[in-house]
Curated annotation (Swiss-Prot):
This is Nucleoside diphosphate kinase. Major role in the synthesis of nucleoside triphosphates other than ATP. The ATP gamma phosphate is transferred to the NDP beta phosphate via a ping-pong mechanism, using a phosphorylated active-site intermediate. It catalyses: a 2'-deoxyribonucleoside 5'-diphosphate + ATP = a 2'-deoxyribonucleoside 5'-triphosphate + ADP; a ribonucleoside 5'-diphosphate + ATP = a ribonucleoside 5'-triphosphate + ADP. One of its GO terms (cellular component) is cytoplasm. It comes from Laribacter hongkongensis (strain HLHK9). The lineage of its organism: Bacteria, Pseudomonadati, Pseudomonadota, Betaproteobacteria, Neisseriales. Keywords: ATP-binding, Cytoplasm, Kinase, Magnesium, Metal-binding, Nucleotide metabolism, Nucleotide-binding, Phosphoprotein, Transferase.
Length: 141
């Protein structure tokens, strides 16, 4: 099995609900290690840059507004098949369609306020990790 890294963000809605620890427990209980983490309040520029791939999509402005509405918790997860494992733990983007027991089914309110972000591929994980963390901020365990 391949040890991978993926980027995860606990979004403003979940931070406001004080469920960061519960979400971290899901990661760690399922074999993912947190190898870097920081809480930050994204600037508009940071949010627009991070989600630039969606710039032409109709939801882009609402997504940016939501992501700058409060602090987020950004972390790098490491483990076997980390990208896929994290996506399975998160559940479907729309919490109404997410399987019971997934992070979004348990903690998200809507397709917009959906508690967490996770990289969708190894390639994007590398780009997203580098967006928020320097190599010296990631601590292999």
């Amino acid at each position: 099995m391949a040890i991978e890294r993926t980027l995860s963000i606990v979004k403003p809605d979940a931070v406001a609900k004080n469920v960061i620890g519960k979400i971290y427990d899901r990661f760690e209980s399922n074999g993912l290690k947190i190898v870097a983490a920081k809480m930050k309040h994204l600037s508009r520029r940071e949010a627009e840059g991070f989600y630039a791939v969606h710039k032409e999509r109709p939801f882009f402005n609402d997504l940016v507004e939501f992501m700058i509405s409060g602090p987020v918790m950004v972390q790098v997860l490491e483990g076997e098949n980390a990208v896929l494992k994290n996506r399975e733990l998160m559940g479907a983007t729309d919490p109404k369609k997410a399987d019971a027991g997934t992070i979004r089914a348990d903690f998200a309110e809507s397709i917009d306020a959906n508690a967490v972000h996770g990289s969708d591929s190894l390639e994007n994980a590398a780009i997203e990790i580098a967006y928020f963390f320097s190599a010296t901020e990631v601590c292999p365990r």
